């Protein structure tokens, strides 16, 4: 038998390549036409009510925890175990973040001075120099009260009525 007899009658090598490329080209053309219409992830038209969605999100960590705790499931795939571990990490991260936020709020709240009645009780978290602020304020208020009693013409606190500005001296005021 010759080689020509072993060949399938009907399609030559060029025709066979063109026949297999034709569906591929038509598929690519179809995808190119539809690419502009798809601009995001598909959204399910049947959304769950918020209560059921919250319940589902609460059940996921419980199911993963029970799945990972049971060692009697050797037939479970490694990929499924990894998925459960990733989900458990995702659900634990927001809890850790809220714990950090609560600690920051606690420290900020108790770093302020606490006033009980007439006495000022300063927390030990406050910087020692910040404890001097009330004393400085009291000194300034005393100085202000002393300056009130002195008249505007009389020298008070080292200032006089017509003082030179910007280093300039006026002969009429000396």
Curated annotation (Swiss-Prot):
Keywords: Amidation, Cleavage on pair of basic residues, Neuropeptide, Oxidation, Secreted, Signal
Annotated signal peptide: 1-37
Positions carrying Asparagine amide: 166
Any GO CC annotation of this UniProt entry: terminal bouton
Methionine sulfoxide: residues bearing it: 141
Residues of the propeptide: 38-105, 170-174
Superkingdom, taxonomy of origin: Eukaryota
Tissue-specificity statement: Expressed throughout the gastrointestinal tract with highest levels in the duodenum and jejunum. Low levels in spinal cord, hypothalamus, and stomach. Neuromedin-U-23: Expressed in the small intestine and the pituitary gland (at protein level). Neuromedin precursor-related peptides: Expressed in pituitary gland and small intestine (at protein level).
Classification via Pfam families: NMU
Record has Transmembrane helix as a keyword: no
InterPro entries membership: Neuromedin-U_amidation-site (IPR018070), NMU (IPR042384), NMU_C (IPR008200)
PROSITE patterns: NMU (PS00967)
One MF term in the entry's GO annotations: type 1 neuromedin U receptor binding
GO biological process, one term: photoperiodism
Similarity comment: Belongs to the NmU family.
Name of the protein: Neuromedin-U
Species annotation: Rattus norvegicus (Rat)
UniProt gene name: Nmu
